[in-house]
């Protein structure tokens, strides 16, 4: 497995799950602007981004925003992510909770404006989840580069390989193949299949009753190997166990639920199946045609206009100084 010390930094691409990084700071970072407005999402996002760029010196850097969800997934399963609720700031209580939806969206607008003044490329594809965009960029557009995906979302574990590594802002560490195997008993190459079987409460995807990652890994040890296991192979193995007289309920539950697992696999897999041709073209065009630029003075002015006086702009721009501008 390639180690970080072996990286050719000129070939290291940083892919940032923008809303994932932003929301963890929006709900927890207490920073306020000079007029008392909450700006924690902005400051936390920029601070984490600066630290990651300083540590890994990636070039280029892409910040990928959510595009309003996936109509294709909702067509497959109408209840997909239907339980999601607006984020709430964790330091307000009862009736004192402000309009967090408005506050969240306003800070995102400010962040988008600020990032335009840096040599960072922002990617937004309508009717598309950031997961799919990052999946495409990682698997295809930057196939031969080393990718670092900045996200705490386990959905991206299926992308981990010798050429793709995840940096978790929650754990403050790199997540590589062995970490996934050690924690889940499943290799990243089989992570999407395992998730299709076990389900995902965070996305409102029901799994097979009585089957979690621990049970699945125990009953199907081949999932821990660096070899892709197909759904049909999994079903065949489960059916064989049942026919051989196994009393383990997990085998029967899996063997009897091919349709559910196949549907879930369509929902959780990050590949081109959930992207339209025009969306793929948009991703390619953005990546190929972006011309980095920087405007530090305007960046400072924009921060001051929002009452943000505590962020160290010099450090951010120094961290990004290795990215050549047009």
Which functions belong to the PLM regions below?
Residues 1, 128-139, 185-195:
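Short, motif-level signal for alpha-helix interfacial/capping segments enriched in acidic residues
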Residues 108-109, 152, 192-197:
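Intrinsically disordered, low-complexity segments enriched in polar/charged residues with Gly/Pro
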